[in-house]
């Protein structure tokens, strides 16, 4: 994709709850001029495309249709939400093997179409499936991106904002590491309108230290809470994906928390995709933003990466995945 291209095309692979919510977000936020939707349930996809097109008189012109893999050849962005859903009591990492098989099949067909754009991965476990998308595609690491901790960071900012009584957009704070149980809050660099969070709390007494611990736990475990109540999470991640999509298609050079390839940005963290802030634009990841972590945070980053690496190494020791790797 070039930054000057006017007609922006997105292909969505996976028309489940996350995918259809993402498609709706693209329509209502006037993002892209063309949206093709791929799913094994073609009739459902056709119905969604028709339903979404009925909103266009209220938004902006857009071509929306049920697509095939051949339609990926000239897409600027392919968004992968296809995968087995996370069930109550199941961790994101429990999904690994079945979703790796789906990922391999999907990515192979997309690359065969002649696709030269950017992959944006949202299926879980997202850090591992972003890595496998990079391996199976043979693409440069900058053009394979995962949604990473974008939603986790949004949940964190919203929870802090609600606790201290400000707009979430005035809270600047990140969750880093795995999108999952080993993620961690970067407390050392959290701030409210430029005021360090700890300085803010000292001056305003909005919450004590135990309150912060409880707040992080609620953020980390938010998906489990939602899944237990309604079966799946999809609205929050859909809007996060729409935000990332806009940053790419509009060449924003926006700083967003994403699943980014690691090659020594942090000591002891290499050869995996994991959540950290990065600058993203029309050509994918421009560069990671390496927040200076304190010793405790760095240890958490290393532990999170080691957990992911153990699972990745085990998965790619199997012939069915190792033989398909191009990177």
Curated annotation (Swiss-Prot):
Positions of substrate binding: 86, 92, 124-127, 152-155, 233
Residues involved in NAD(+) binding: 18, 39, 44, 69, 83-84, 122-124, 147
Key word NAD present: yes
Gene Ontology biological-process entries: glycolytic process; lactate metabolic process
PROSITE patterns: L_LDH
GO terms, molecular function: L-lactate dehydrogenase activity
Keywords assigned: Allosteric enzyme, Cytoplasm, NAD, Oxidoreductase, Phosphoprotein
Chief subcellular location: cytoplasm
Catalytic residue positions: 179
Entry's EC annotation: 1.1.1.27
Protein localization: Cytoplasm
GO cellular component, one term: cytoplasm
Record-linked Pfam families: Ldh_1_C, Ldh_1_N
Enzyme class: oxidoreductase
Regulation of activity: Allosterically activated by fructose 1,6-bisphosphate (FBP).
Keyword Oxidoreductase belongs to the record: yes
Binding site for beta-D-fructose 1,6-bisphosphate: 157, 172
Modified residues annotated as Phosphotyrosine in this record: 224
Catalytic function, reaction form: (S)-lactate + NAD(+) = pyruvate + NADH + H(+)
InterPro entries, A to Z: L-lactate/malate_DH (IPR001557), L-lactate_DH (IPR011304), L-lactate_DH_AS (IPR018177), Lactate/malate_DH_C (IPR022383), Lactate/malate_DH_N (IPR001236), Lactate_DH/Glyco_Ohase_4_C (IPR015955), NAD(P)-bd_dom_sf (IPR036291)
Family: Belongs to the LDH/MDH superfamily. LDH family.
Function: Catalyzes the conversion of lactate to pyruvate.
Subunit structure and binding partners: Homotetramer.
Name of the protein in question: L-lactate dehydrogenase
UniProt organism field: Streptococcus equi subsp. equi (strain 4047)
């Amino acid at each position: 994709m070039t930054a000057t291209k006017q007609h922006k095309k997105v292909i969505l692979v996976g028309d489940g709850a996350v995918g259809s919510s993402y498609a709706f977000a693209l329509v209502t936020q006037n993002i892209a001029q063309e949206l093709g939707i791929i799913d094994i349930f073609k009739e459902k996809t056709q119905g969604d495309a028709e339903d979404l097109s009925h909103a266009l008189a209220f938004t902006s012109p857009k071509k929306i249709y049920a697509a095939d893999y051949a339609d990926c050849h000239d897409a600027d962005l392919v968004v992968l939400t296809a995968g087995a859903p996370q069930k109550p009591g199941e961790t994101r990492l429990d999904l690994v093997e079945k979703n790796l098989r789906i990922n391999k099949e999907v990515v192979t067909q997309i690359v065969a179409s002649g696709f030269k754009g950017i992959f944006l991965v949202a299926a879980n476990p997202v850090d591992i499936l972003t890595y496998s998308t990079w391996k199976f595609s043979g693409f440069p690491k900058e053009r394979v991106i995962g949604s990473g901790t974008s939603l986790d960071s949004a949940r964190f900012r919203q929870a802090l904002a609600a606790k201290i009584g400000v707009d979430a957009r005035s809270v600047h704070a990140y969750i880093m590491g795995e999108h999952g149980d080993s993620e961690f809050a970067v407390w050392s660099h959290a701030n409210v309108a430029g005021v360090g969070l700890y300085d803010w709390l000292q001056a305003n007494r909005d919450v004590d230290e135990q309150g912060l611990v409880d707040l992080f736990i609620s953020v980390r475990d938010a998906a489990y809470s939602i899944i237990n109540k309604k079966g799946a999470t999809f609205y929050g991640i859909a809007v996060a994906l729409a935000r990332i999509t806009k940053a790419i298609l509009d060449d924003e050079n926006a700083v967003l928390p994403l699943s980014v390839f690691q090659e020594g940005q942090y000591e002891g963290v290499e050869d995996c995709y994991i959540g950290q802030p990065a600058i993203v634009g029309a050509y994918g990841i421009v560069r990671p933003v390496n927040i200076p972590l304190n010793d405790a945070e760095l240890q958490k980053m290393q532990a999170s990466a080691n957990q992911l690496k153990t699972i990745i190494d085990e998965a790619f020791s199997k012939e069915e995945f190792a033989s398909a790797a191009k990177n």
